[in-house]
Amino acid sequence: MGDIIYIPKGKAREYSPYSLNIYNGCDHNCKYCYVKTMPYYKKVSNEEIKPKKNILEKLEKQLKKQEINEQVLLCFVGDPYCKTDTEYKLTRDILKILLRYDIPTAILSKGGERILRDLDLFKKFNKIKIGATLTLLDEEESLYYEPGAVLPRERIKVLGILHDEGIKTWVSFEPVIKPLTTYQLLELSYPFIDQYKVGKMNHYQLPYQIDWRDFGNTITKRLIELKKDFYIKKDLYKYMSLKLDDNYIDQDYLTLRKPRVKIIPEETKVLQPTLF
């Protein structure tokens, strides 16, 4: 059996040097979820989400023999504050172990107010950041694309509460379903968000085209204007005519460096055709 804390591969590596998945499956059932493209997904029932077997014991065993000083993300597969966690409360137990070993921790969740259950633990960490994926604002659209997730405005509200409590906050703008909505989400959230990670749509076929070059350039310029820490994922960056220095970000640490930006002429950058 593999370690509970593992090194993510491929595109996931842009989010964190380490990750930890608590449950098998996810009850959010998001239409765009990349996990649905994996063979693993076919073996998991979203109707019966179960904890990984003996996860607490295995985590303790791993941390006794392996020193981990870099960020661990909860979670890439599934949500640490899914509805199932209200029964098992395993995320809280996992956090207690990570806290004891002083491991830098990041959380990404669409669990809304369920996250606040562990606010007392968050405050004890030396390095922790709590984030949410924000894709839409309209409730009907959210229920269509993310039928099991907490509605976006509740996620935004909780991030504001966490910020007021002194917790570092972040947002994942990935996937991007409607660029105009993503711009709105940025304007709503930036007063209480410390950092953003921005991607595109990769695994779900939208019924319309998106100008990824325009979106990437526009949101990056606005993030710079707002003096926000951010990371533009490689899948989006390759479309952009806005050139960022290679070393403007340290993706393995909780504090992103300030971007240094310069514009390069359109004709000097070969843009990929849109995928849709």
Predicted regions span which residues?
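Conserved AdoMet/S-adenosylmethionine-binding subsite of the radical SAM
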Residues: N54-L226
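N-terminal [4Fe-4S]-dependent radical SAM core
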Residues: M1-Q71
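Auxiliary Fe-S-binding modules of radical SAM enzymes
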Residues: M1-K11, G166, V176-F276
